Amino acid sequence: MSNILDCLREGEEVEVKGPSGEIRYLGHGRFEVDDNERRFDNVTLILGGSGVTPGYQIIARILNTPDDKPRVKVIDANKSENDILLSSELEDFARNHCEQFQIAHVLSHPSDKWKGLKGHLNEDVIKEHAFEPAEGNVALLCGPPTMIQKAALPALRDWGYDDDRNLFGF
């Protein structure tokens, strides 16, 4: 989306639709998903591009709530280092909440200096950096439709995650 917005000229208009689903964090592992309360101990967030922004709200709420216990793993997919939004805030969380929070960035077009994951989001990246599909675990997705539809959803479903039980998009 940011690539499209960069190309707009002053005065041009954009129609925006969203959000399609509602996920709210209520505290202490409790989530409200489309008006139903659910409880999860381990949260995987698979985010891409500007999708990190709503994901960040959930992360911050969990990590900044005293005595909140859910563990969070994030896979953040971008093109390059310059495209990673909220980079310093996420790295601060990783440093200050290392027992509760982990983040893996995967870049499709990194610089030669990049030492992290390279390529596109795929099943191997997901299985290495996400919580396995078990009771009390959830995967939440927000990112470009192609990444979600072609990579994240098939890999998570094949692994054992189920739509509307422990697999949700927002």
What are these regions (language model features)?
Residues P54-P66:
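Histidine-anchored nucleotide/phosphate-binding helix
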Residues V43-L47, L141-P144:
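Catalytic cysteine-centered active loop of the rhodanese-like fold, especially the PTP/DSP P-loop
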Residues G11, G51, P144:
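Short, conserved phosphate/pyrophosphate- and ester-handling motifs at nucleotide-, phospho-/glycolipid
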Residues F40-D41, L63-V72:
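Conserved S-adenosyl-L-methionine
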Residues P70-F170:
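Reductase modules of NAD(P)H-dependent flavoproteins
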Residues M1-L45, I58, H97, L107-S108, ...:
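FAD-binding FR-type
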Residues S50-G55, I148:
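Hydrophobic/small residue at the entry helix of a nucleotide-binding pocket
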Residues D34-N36, T65-P66, H129-P133:
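Surface-exposed acidic, glycine-flexible loop patches that form ligand/cofactor-binding
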